[in-house]
Amino acid sequence: MALQTTGILDDLIARGYRYMNTSNADNLGAAPDGRLAAWFAASGAPYSPEVCLRTPADRKGGHLAIRRSDGRMILRDTAQTPDEDMRWFTDEHRHRFFHTNNLWFDLVALRDALAARGGLPGLPLIRNRKHVDPSDPSSPEVFQVESALGAIVELFDGARPVLVPRERFLPVKTTDDLALL
């Protein structure tokens, strides 16, 4: 994680910073919010992802779940879900909350969690099938490999999701999305 390997994480802590909020650059609803910052600081949680109530439009988005094998909270993404489980994954009544990728971190807890793992968060890889030219389905198929920072939830005991209003999640993926604003 770049914050740790560059020394920035230790530097922030040494300068007295304790909390950090991150979000996706394309989420125009992810503005700083003093009330959320105060809640997070008072909560004592090491990590808190913002979640919204899920709608049918969010069927493909990630959500939090409890892993059966060890009871840990995890972030599940569409690309990580087997086809036979997709009907459950997309059920907004079963999984009521949508993960916004607005994340709150206690920097000391983040430093300690990374140190306990040799500096590597060990985030699960997500494999997405794509075409070299997205507008041409006959172009060669490739795999895009990525990880989601929100998956870091499984590193923290005591992570506490916080339900936020939908206005905190306004992703802009296309020019049409931008025009709607």
Where are these regions (language model features)?
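Catalytic core of tubulin tyrosine ligase-like
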Residues: 10-24, 29-181
